[in-house]
């Protein structure tokens, strides 16, 4: 998407290894993971206090697995800027190092999915058996209602997957067969 679109909402990912090492894996900044984590927290708090961002939620992922071990610590964020900005401006403000690490989240569906991904409670993350992070690991400022955001829109809430339909159909079939459920009762369960 061209950089002429302005929006308030963005998702951001920052990575410890990428911010402290060059492409050849040589150390460029000699700080520990804990120091980096505190630096990111202070940076975001400062942006919030300065009024440049209205609200945000972030979480540090340090338990994500690769085939070779654990993925380097990284942070995921959902940020509402105080004023609409182009992606390049948001990237510069939020410390994104790559176009891939800062993305638009102006649609409610994008925010719902991104907020669920913070904890790894998206269907895709759970199917991939990713570590589920606890809500107590979230860092939130500005009163962002993460539960409301996770729910998304009414349309999204009513969308169910094919496997969920299969499970429901099987359950209703068994109840009709075993308990003599009527068509009317089955419809009530469906709707």
Predicted regions: what is each one?
Residues 1-45, 84-191:
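Catalytic "initiation/cleavage/transfer" segments centered on a nucleophilic residue
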Residues 2, 47-48, 65-69:
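Short secondary-structure boundary/capping segments within folded domains
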Residues 45-55:
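Short secondary-structure junctions
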Residues 55-94, 118:
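Histidine-centered divalent-metal-coordination microenvironment in nucleic-acid enzymes
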């Amino acid at each position: 998407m061209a950089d002429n679109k302005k929006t308030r909402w963005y998702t951001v990912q920052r990575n410890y290894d990428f911010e402290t090492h060059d492409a050849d894996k040589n150390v460029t900044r000699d700080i520990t993971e804990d120091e980096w984590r505190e630096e990111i927290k202070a940076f975001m708090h400062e942006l919030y206090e300065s009024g440049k961002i209205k609200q945000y939620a972030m979480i540090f992922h340090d338990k994500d697995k690769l085939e070779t071990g654990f993925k380097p610590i990284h942070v995921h964020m959902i940020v509402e800027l105080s004023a609409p900005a182009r992606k390049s401006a948001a990237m510069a403000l939020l410390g994104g190092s790559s176009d891939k690490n800062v993305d638009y989240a102006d649609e409610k569906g994008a925010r719902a999915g991104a907020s669920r991904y913070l904890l790894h409670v998206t269907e895709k993350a759970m199917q991939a058996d990713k570590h589920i992070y606890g809500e107590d690991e979230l860092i939130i400022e500005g009163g962002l209602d993460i539960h409301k955001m996770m729910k998304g829109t009414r349309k999204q809430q009513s969308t169910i997957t094919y496997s969920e339909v299969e499970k429901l159909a099987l359950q209703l079939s068994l109840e009709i067969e075993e308990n003599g459920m009527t068509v009317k009762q089955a419809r009530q369960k469906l709707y």
